[in-house]
Curated annotation (Swiss-Prot):
Keyword annotations from UniProtKB, A to Z: FAD, Flavoprotein, Oxidoreductase
Keyword Oxidoreductase assigned: yes
Gene3D superfamilies: D-Amino Acid Oxidase, subunit A, domain 2, FAD/NAD(P)-binding domain
Protein name: D-amino acid dehydrogenase
Domain of life: Bacteria
The UniProt record lists the keyword GTP-binding: no
GO biological process, one term: D-alanine catabolic process
First-tier enzyme category under EC: oxidoreductase
Cofactor dependency: FAD
């Protein structure tokens, strides 16, 4: 089977790896000069298998109103003329109930835990390195109220058998002694010992090199113009003015996936959630994080690589704008100076932004479509790095008609369709859509 993958970020590259291992002839195309150079380039570096949570959560609507007036708000909305922005926001608000939050988080945890297993197996098989650490993650709470709210997450962690520890202030410093130099005294924290860290871009590029050795063809500098449709089937894509035919096409274009699908009448509710990062040369290891922490108040993570510190997070709903907002840099600098002062060189920091492809419910869109030969692997939001290996392996099983190792419930685009459209992929299990 000849498979054409559109996009060579971490999602497209892991898809290529697993499809190649399944015996497919794989071609990957991307507009950049190499793999992992857009949203995968400088994300937070957290592999948050246990921390997986949707942005749509109880209390977020009221918080969003308050955040409108805060300089360092974790979520901001910049109105555009794009009607899709408002439709997406309205759908997200519908998922902020406790009931929907529990359903969505359970789906995300299912995929994230599977992805942890897949990444561990891939690493053992290939020996791939990406400045990774297996030292867990810590979610820091600045207020007792934040600590009290985490109870609902703990219930789901217990349900899925995910190890966790609720830390007292003294226990926090045991795992992250560098926090003692900071100006904040946290009343408590949640530690997830099975979570990891690593450089997503480094992983993507090294996995692409390994996949190329297996025969996967990577073509860079390629613009995907449109999909080729023959009746009920997608038969390829027009790339740089030429038709590239394939038995199966995988759309892994992140936030740009809906733009390619719209001419086919497929309204995919994926919208850019703009994130920011600041990468600093490390200047004092004793004052740096041992692993990674997430400041819950600002949704900013501080992560340690070998000789670098990555400060990343926040979300800005502002369409496809990729300009660098100096106010967001100020927030990143404020947080790292609060928690790990003196750990990195702010004067030599690399400021970056990326468009994270978010769904209203937080769960990605992986699987079949109403068109034969067309599959999706997109919509991972802030958790593309976390979910990448599991998503790629799961998709390869679907495409190759093999039994999936996890339930497909709620993972494909059919959950968004109001009317019941039967899945045309004969082998891929589809879940009946829900309104």
């Amino acid at each position: 089977m000849r498979v054409l993958i559109l996009g060579s970020g971490v999602i497209g590259t892991t898809s290529a790896w697993y499809l190649s291992k399944a015996g497919c002839e794989v071609v990957v195309v991307d507009r950049q000069s190499g793999a992992g150079l857009e949203t995968s380039y400088a994300n937070g570096g957290q592999l948050s298998f246990g921390y997986t949570s949707p942005w749509a959560a109880p209390g977020v609507p009221l918080k969003a109103v308050r955040w409108l007036f805060e300089r360092h708000a974790p979520l901001s909305i910049r109105p555009t003329t794009d009607w899709n922005q408002y439709v997406w926001l309205a759908r997200m608000l519908r998922h902020c109930s406790a009931e929907r939050y529990a359903v969505n988080k359970s789906r995300m945890l299912r995929l994230s835990e599977y992805s942890r297993e897949a990444l561990e197996a891939l690493s053992a098989e290939t020996g791939i390195t990406f400045e990774g650490r297996h030292l867990g993650t810590i979610q820091l709470f600045r207020t007792q109220q934040q600590l009290d709210v985490v109870v609902r997450d703990i219930e789901l962690l217990t349900q899925y058998g995910i190890p966790y520890e609720v830390l007292s202030p003294s226990q926090i410093s045991k795992f992250e002694p560098g926090l003692a130099d900071g100006s904040v005294r946290f009343p408590g924290a949640l530690r997830l010992p099975h979570d990891q860290t690593g450089d997503c871009c480094l992983f993507t590029q090294r996995l692409a090199a390994l996949a190329a050795k297996r025969g996967v063809e990577f073509r860079y500098g390629c613009t995907v113009q449109r999909l080729e449709v023959d009746g009920p089937r997608v038969t390829g894509a027009w790339i740089n003015g030429a038709l590239e035919r394939a038995d199966c096409c995988v759309v892994a274009l992140g936030s740009y996936s809906p733009l390619l699908l719209a001419p086919l009448g497929l309204r995919l509710p994926v919208y850019p959630l703009k994130g920011f990062s600041l990468t600093l040369p490390m200047i004092d290891a004793s004052r740096a994080p041992v692993s990674t922490v997430l400041d819950e108040s600002y949704k900013v993570a501080v992560t340690r690589f070998d000789e670098r510190i990555r400060v990343a997070g926040m979300a800005e709903v502002s369409g496809y704008d990729v300009s660098l907002n100096p106010r967001r840099r100020a927030t990143l600098e404020m947080v790292v100076q609060d928690v790990y002062p003196g750990c990195g060189d702010l004067g030599r920091g690399e400021f970056w932004t990326g468009l994270r492809p978010a769904t209203p419910d937080g769960t990605p869109v992986i699987g079949a479509t109403p068109y034969q030969g067309l599959f999706l692997n997109t919509g991972h939001g802030t958790l593309g790095w976390t979910m990448s290996s599991g998503s790629g392996r799961y998709l390869a099983d679907l495409i190759c008609c093999r039994p999936c190792e996890i339930s497909s419930e709620g993972l494909d685009m059919f959950r968004y369709l109001v009317s019941t459209i039967p899945c045309p992929q004969e082998c891929a299990p589809c879940v009946p859509p829900t309104p």
